[in-house]
Structures are given as structure tokens and as C-alpha cells.
Amino acid sequence: MVFRIASSPYTHNQRQTSRIMLLVVIAALPGIAAQTWFFGWGTLFQIVLAAITALVAEAIVLRLRKQSVASHLQDYSALLTGLLLAVSIPPLAPWWMVVLGTGFAIIIAKQLYGGLGQTPFNPAMIGYVVLLISFPVQMTSWLPPYEIAATTPDMLDTLRMIFTGHTASGGDMTLLRIGIDGISQATPLDTFKTSLRAGHSVEQIMQYPIYSGALAGVGWQWVNLAWLVGGVFLLWQKAIRWHIPVSFLLTLALCAALGWLFSPATLASPQLHLLSGATMLGAFFILTDPVTASTTNRGRLIFGALAGVLVWLIRSFGGYPDGVAFAVLLANITVPLIDYYTRPRVYGHRKG
């Protein structure tokens, strides 16, 4: 009788990093399609710019570090970083912003720390926060969804806006942000926070066109549901684990429900938190980054819950309308501590 002898581990996962990254890119397609449908061609153009910048920046740094360019680019991590940053910024943001943010994410936030697997912070969110702090006006200049927009740029005008700041007829961002009610529009979360500070009641705010007939803002709820579809695909493919997105969404919903219950006149409803902004994108595509998230199951639950609390606090009491990027980076800081206290006990270990 012949016995097969093998060393541990006895179960193997043959899925390579490049396959995981490619699955995430594929899972992002519903969200990209929804954003393009509601906000125009700019989303696709920003993705192309970010992808080119990410690949070029990665190649240059790898060449300087005397590492194999081809093998590293084939893991698709740079491409994914550019994609996540591109879908997070306004579709008509100037071209140099996505180039600057993506370059910073790849060169400083990723390669400076040693490359893939060495970064303590999510590179895409580092790039996003750098842009948000440096250029707050441009980073909050989202177009109204097409169905409530007074003017909608076509593909060529979108290109002109990104590269020149004006349409063929001389229109600018101020004109394009005007809604059907003649008032400059913002995202649902931005509108909610700004209007509250102006002294408007929640009941008045919910009558604005951006919330008309919608659970959480015209267009935005469908964008979030599209990212949710992509997230479910990742769970089905076992590209990510359920712990972080579930704990994040449940904690955010719980905090929002309690806040809304005790202060409905000043705090947003749970559905607004769950289906607006970057909630689903953050839950399934950003927080689940295996490099910067916790590595134990208990740690993942804590990590996701912490991010959920931080998002709610920033949105409700902070200076920024969304807060997902800041919550991700703040949660990243705690990962070593979380992993230290949640690591499994070694078999045979006994308390002293």
C-alpha cells in the first residue's frame, strides 16, 4: 500500500492575488454603471485617467526600485486603487485632481511603504482624503442626478469640462449643478448637513427635489444598491468575508436608528445613512481590503463596527457630509491593536 505524505497545511487555496483583484474590478461594474447612468460619462473618464496614472506611477516606482514591472502590474492592485479613487470623486472634477490623487495613492501611500501587502492605510482613501482636504470645493461639486438636473452635458461636453472647465456653449460647473428647481444641487448627505446648519427642519429638507420620491436621495439609493449587488457577488465568490461589511452596516444602522429615535429633528434617518454617499462602496470594496483590515474574524467584526460608529459620528456631528474615507483611515490605525487582542490562542497555551 502506498501512502501519500504531505506537509501542512493540508488544504490549499490556489486563488492568486491577481484573481482576487480582478474579481473586485468585475464586482465594481454594477456600481460604475449606475454612477454613469445617473451622473454621466465623467465617471468613466475619471476611471480611465486614474487607471493610466496608477499604472504609470507604479511602473516608474518599480523601475526605480529595480523590481519587475510586468509581474507587479499583473496583480491589478494599482488598477483597483485607481478605480476606487475615481468612483469616489465628482465625475467632472478637473483632470489634474484625479492624476494628483492617484499618483499620491500609488507613490506615497503604497510604494513608499514597500508596495502591496505592506501598507497600513488604504491607498485609495489616502489619495481621496488628500484631495478632499486640499481642494474641498472641487471635491464636493457633484452634479445632480440627470432626472433632476436642469442641464445635462453630453459626452464631448463632459470631456471639455474635465480638461478645460467649460462646455462648448461656455457653461461651467455652477450652471451644471443647478437643478430643475433653479437651485444649485449637492449630494443628499451634503444637502442634509448644510440645510440643518441653515436652520431648516428635517421635514423641510425632505421636501427638496433631491429626496423627491426616494428613500435616500434621487439616484444615490440606486447607486448604493448597485454597489451592494457587487458586494454580494464578492461574498458569493468568497473574495471577501462577511464579517466586516455586515458589522459595519449593522452598526451604522443601529447608531442611525437610535439617533433618529431620540433626535428626529436634527439627525438623519437610517435609510439615508445606508443608501447615500459611499456607504455600500465602503462596506464591500474599501473596508474589506485584506492588507489594511483586521486579520481575525473577531477582529473583523470589531473593525467593521468601529468604522460604522465613526461614519455615523462624522456624518452627524463632524465637518464633512460623508465621512467614510476618514472612518476607514481611523479604523486602519487600530488594526494592530485589534489583531493583538483578538488573535487565536495557540493550541496548548494556558493562562498564567
UniProtKB/Swiss-Prot annotation:
Between which residues do disulfide bridges form?
none
Which family is annotated? Belongs to the NqrB/RnfD family.
Is Cell membrane one of the keywords UniProt gives this record?
yes
Cofactor(s) for this UniProt protein: FMN
Q: Which residues cross the membrane?
A: 20-40, 42-62, 69-91, 123-143, 215-235, 242-262, 267-287, 301-321, 322-342
Spell out the protein name for this chain: Ion-translocating oxidoreductase complex subunit D
Q: What is its EC number?
A: 7.-.-.-
Quaternary state and partners of this protein? The complex is composed of six subunits: RsxA, RsxB, RsxC, RsxD, RsxE and RsxG.
How is it placed in the membrane, per its record?
A: Multi-pass membrane protein
Query: Sorted alphabetically, which Pfam families does this protein's record hold?
Result: NQR2_RnfD_RnfE
* Major localization listed first in the record, in broad terms: membrane
* FMN phosphoryl threonine: residues bearing it: T187
HAMAP family with a match to the protein in the record: RsxD_RnfD
Query: Coiled-coil stretches, from where to where?
Result: none
Q: Which UniProt keywords apply?
A: Cell inner membrane, Cell membrane, Electron transport, Flavoprotein, FMN, Membrane, Phosphoprotein, Translocase, Transmembrane, Transmembrane helix, Transport
